[in-house]
């Protein structure tokens, strides 16, 4: 397979404001020539990503929303469609890791939040965006 097959592809990366998501987004842009749309909640962190990308920032844009809300994915798909953006790859990276504790010490709210972000956000994104990819 051609090593440059990813060049000029459009990739959506969730959790792109830090950690692995930020690293994935940066590598896709710098090492592979991709255009990346980062998804996160913090505008401050996303602006920092743009700043750190320097001259490569032209290949990065971002949308701010909570990935655990299905309607946000529907709205994002409409944004892509309205702007004639055709994603090629989806990287479902967003996730949270609750503090380590005995299971019985977790509240149902903690468990629901982790499931919504770590599981349902991937389901919502794939279900909504797969027809476009």
Regions found by a protein language model. Name each.
Residues 10-13, 90-91:
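Conserved hydrophobic beta-strands of the Rossmann-like cofactor-binding core
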Residues 17-19:
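Conserved glycine-rich cofactor-binding loop
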Residues 32-48:
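Conserved glycine-rich Rossmann-like NAD(P)H-binding loop of the short-chain dehydrogenase/reductase
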Residues 44, 64-75, 108:
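The beta1-alpha1 cofactor-binding region of Rossmann-like NAD(H)/NADP(H)-dependent oxidoreductases
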Residues 94-99:
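Conserved NAD(P)H cofactor-binding loop of Rossmann-fold oxidoreductase domains
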Residues 101-103, 107-113:
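Substrate-binding pocket helix/loop in short-chain dehydrogenase/reductase
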Residues 126-127:
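A short, exposed helix-loop element centered on a Lys and neighboring polar residues
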């Amino acid at each position: 397979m051609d090593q440059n097959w990813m060049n000029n592809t459009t990739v959506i990366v969730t959790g792109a404001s830090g950690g692995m998501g930020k690293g994935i987004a940066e590598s896709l842009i710098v090492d592979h020539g991709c255009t990346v749309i980062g998804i996160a909640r913090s505008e401050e962190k996303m602006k920092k990503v743009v700043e750190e990308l320097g001259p490569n920032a032209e290949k990065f844009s971002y949308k701010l929303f909570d990935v655990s809300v299905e309607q946000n994915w529907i709205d994002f798909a409409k944004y892509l469609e309205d702007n004639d953006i055709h994603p090629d790859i989806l990287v479902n990276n967003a996730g949270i890791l609750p503090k380590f504790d005995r299971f019985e010490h977790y509240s149902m709210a903690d468990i629901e939040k982790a499931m919504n972000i770590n599981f349902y956000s991937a389901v919502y994104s794939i279900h909504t965006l797969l027809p476009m990819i």
